[in-house]
Structures are given as C-alpha cells and as structure tokens.
Amino acid sequence: MRRRALKNSVAGILALFVLSLLGGSVAAQENVFTVQQPDYQRSPYTGMTRQHWIQAGEYLLQGAFNYIHTLDDQMYFPKQLDKTYPNNDGQVPVAKLEGLARTLFVAAPLLKDNPDLVMNGIKVADYYRHQLVNLSNPKSKSYIPHRKGGPSQTLLELGSLAISMKAAQAILWDPLTKSQKDSLAATMLSYGEGPTIGSNWMFFNVFILSFMKDQGYVVNDDYLESNLKKLLARYRGEGWYNDAPAYDYYSAWAYQTYGPIWAEMFGKKQYPQLAQQFLANQHDMVANYPYMFSRDGKMNMWGRSICYRFASVAPLALLEYDQSGEVNYGWIRRIASSTLLQFLERPEFLEDGVPTMGFYEPFAPAVQIYSCRGSVYWCGKAFLSLLLPEDAEFWTAKENTGPWEKELKKGNVYNQFQPGTNLLITNYPNSGASEMRSWCHETVAKDWQKFRSTENYNKLAYNTEFPWMADGNNGEISMNYGTKNKKGEWEVLRLYTFQSFKDGIYRRDAVLETDSTVKYQLADIPLPNGILRVDKVSVSEPTEICLGHYSLPRLNTNIQETSRKVDRPVSYTHLTLPTTSR
C-alpha cells in the first residue's frame, strides 16, 4: 500500500518516496466491445479504423436503444448512485432531455453515414426527429416549456441538440415542417437568448443562436458575439482554457471541442476572425495535451465529470479543421482509439447497457451531484470524429506512438511545464506513464457541490497507471498528505499555492484548511522511476501526519510493513507492495 506516519513538534523534512509503476490486464468478457477484423496494417497498435469507430458507436448506442420500444419512449435510464439526480419528480424532465441530447452526440455522426440506421426495431432518424418535434409540443410527455427563470441544465442540453442538428441537418432538421421548425426554434431561443453562466456554459447559448441564425431566424447578434468573446477571454495559453476556476478536461471536451466545431459549422461564415482565434488556440494544444496520455494511449483519471471518460479525445480529430501546422495524426488517432478501448473493452464499463457512473466502474467519489445516468453520454462527443470524411488524414495515417518512439528515451524523465496555467505534465519512458500536477485551492466549507475540494482535484499528482483512491476516515489516503486536525479527523491538503518550476523541481506551498498554522512547503522532483519528494512541514504543536503513495493494486503479493525510528520524536511506518516489472 502507501503510508508513512510522522509526529513532529515544530518542523520536519519529509524526503522521498520513489514509486515503481505496475501493470495489469483485464480479460475480455461478453459485455465488452470487440474489434472485429482488426486492421493492423493501418493501425498496428489498436487495429481500429474509421469503420471500427462506427461499430463502436453502434455498440454504445444499442445499449441506449434497448430502452426504446416506440417513438414516444424517452431516453431515461436506471438511476445509479444516490448522490446523482433526479431526486424528485421535478428533475425528471431534464434528466430525460439529457439522455436525448447526449445520445444524439453518438447518433448524429452515425446517421450522417447511414440515415437508415435501425436500433431495437426503431429507425433511429425517425426516433430523434419525433423527439425533437415533441420538445415544443405541449401535449407530449417530452415537452419543454419556454424559459421562465435563470440559467439551467435545459440550456446545456438544447445547445447540445443544436450541434447535432447541424451535424446531421439533412436527416434531423431539414425534413421538419416550417411550423415544426418555428415552434422548436422558439423554444430553443427562449433559452439561448436567456442568461448563462460565465464558464463553458456560454457555448450552449452560442450554438443555439448560431444554428438558428444559420437557418434564417432573427437572433440577438450582440449577445452571440459577446458570449464568443467572453469564451475566448478564458484562454490562458498552451492550449488551455480556464473553466472558472479550474483546469481540467473541460478545457478539452468543452472549449477545445466546441470552439473548433463552432468555427467549422458556423464561425467561418458568421464571425471569421473569432473562428480563426478558436482554431489558433486549438492548435496550441498539440504541443502539450497529447502528452497527458500514456505511451499506450490511456487517459488519466483527473478532474470532475470523469464519467465522461473518452470525451477527453474529442478535440484530437478536430485538429483537421486547422491546417496551420503539422500534426502527427497517426499518434493522435492511436491515442483516441486506445482511450476508447480503455473503457469499451472492460466488462465493468456498462451496466444495464448504459455506461456506469464512475471511471472503470461505479464509483461515487468521482461523480458529482449535477449528473444523472444519461449524463455519461457526454462521452459520445468522441464520435464527432466521424464527421470527418474517410480520406481525412486522421483516418488514413498509420498509427504510431509519436515521441514515445524515439524522443522520449528510457532512463530519462521529461517534464512539460506550461507557465500560463502552472500545469506540469511528466512523461516516464521507463514505464510509459504520464502524470499531471494541476490547480487546487478550494475549501470544503465553500465547496457547496463538493467536487473542487475533493480527490478529483486535491491529489499531489495524477498518474495514468494509478487511478486515484478515495480517502478514508482512518487515514487511508492516496497521493496526498493527511493531518490529524484539532477535531481528531484526518484532513488532506487542498489549499495549494504554486511557487515555481525550475531545474526539474515543482514547488508549491499548502496550508491546512482548518488550521493555517499547519504549513507545507512541497517540492516534487520527478525521476526516471518515480518521484523524489523533499517537503517541509511546520506545525505549532505535536501533530500526526501521514503521506500517501499512489493507490496500488494488490496483485499476487502481500503487503509488507516495516517501521523505522529515524530520530526522536520522528517515526515512520511504511507499507509497501513488492514491485514487479511491467
């Protein structure tokens, strides 16, 4: 396992834990996606081609359509985890709308390729058209009334529908009558022209307004342009947007996906200068973002909404929209396909035919209260890659491992520091792992949604090979310090302040939320086979603290415990697992 305990009266220097990286595998079962007739000529690592992506999309969508038996049935799935919504009847309509809008992220690209697609005996195009019409039909159980208050989840889902309606316009929008279009437009514009939140939410106003403007409807152009400029103002450089206030996958699966999609669908015609800026910002991510993934192409468990999983690769294919610089599409597609299979090939990914609320399986600490079961289909944005034609370089390039082939040499460690955000990405060629150090400065007391102060953000680092473990009440803490506070409770660090990155050393200070006299000066030094920590802890009275390692799997070896007394009053207890090579 992972812990050291320390008692100290004034100050202590904690130096060192070096971790060896372990690997494991999961046997395939019936409940998993299988790559049929893999093409190892074009894709020597995953076997995945564009046709396999289509099959993967159909596999994912089939589970949702198992709940659909008539055109009037709604995309409403069994609730999983008590903390998720709906918690009352009033929240059910928007949960159903989420299921509709987010499964359409998968369905729209499939329909563009195959308008006659049938699932569970239902013509998929007929189903979604029927549901779109019903949104503005007061007699339908799918009816969404016009906006009456402030920003709500309904805005997000209607904005998502606008993306899919444009992506497959000939199938989803054009066949509607003028009366049906006008009625749906009025419903959507009541939200799109309404208030929003100054984060990625502004994109949903943008897509509603841009789509309706594209279709000839009169919209609030000033509000549209204002939201676009505010979104661009959230850019911090090196491919990263700040999502008020965090850095996480929302930079990728929201800003760096929606920005280029908007530019391609609407922006080049409506606001060409703003469109070009979104594309330029997107291109900046090439030098950093792909390095977050492991050598094997796996994504990291990092940040909120991690149940969206492979939505993390959504922006990669969209680099095709910007031709200003060179992109290694063989590496980019290898990452995208590997991350997709990272989940689709695991039997725990689906339950009742629907993706689970978690990372690999149901896991409440990684799920937020704003999510419902249908929320998970945000992952479907990965299939926006299918909007690219078959001859796009993203699909035709031969898979490769990019810089992992020659540039990232074994025996070394490689850090990519991004000064605009203070993010640090570290690559370990010896193990193939990638690691992230990022922002966290949120108190539990002010974190009313209980996610920015939690394990989703507060770890010392996040590693592709070690999905994080939830902290326990008895000091079971992974990749963080725990301090026994004045209430006798174990309290982890979450109030970090970045100091510097120089000479391979990433420095942060931290204080305990409930006792600012407990101070940490942290120094992370990535090494080829792990991390050297040189940390100073200052306390005003005798205090018990512990340092947690990455959470490790217990494979075929037992935990070993050793105790060492270094110098009074300092003592250590170290729990380890014998390491094995990958």
Residue spans for each PLM region:
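Extended polysaccharide-engagement surfaces of secreted carbohydrate-active enzymes
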Residues: 320-572
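Aromatic-lined, polymer-binding surfaces characteristic
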Residues: 96-99, 104-114, 121-317
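Bacterial N-terminal signal peptides that target proteins for export
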Residues: 1-13
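Hydrophobic alpha-helical scaffolding
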Residues: 89, 93, 248, 268, ...
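Conserved small/polar residues in nucleotide/adenosyl-binding loops
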Residues: 573-579
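Boundary at the C-terminal end of the N-terminal hydrophobic targeting segment
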Residues: 26-28
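Low-complexity, Ser/Thr/Pro/Gly-enriched N-terminal "stalk/linker" regions
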Residues: 30-98, 123-131
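Bacterial N-terminal signal peptides
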Residues: 12-21
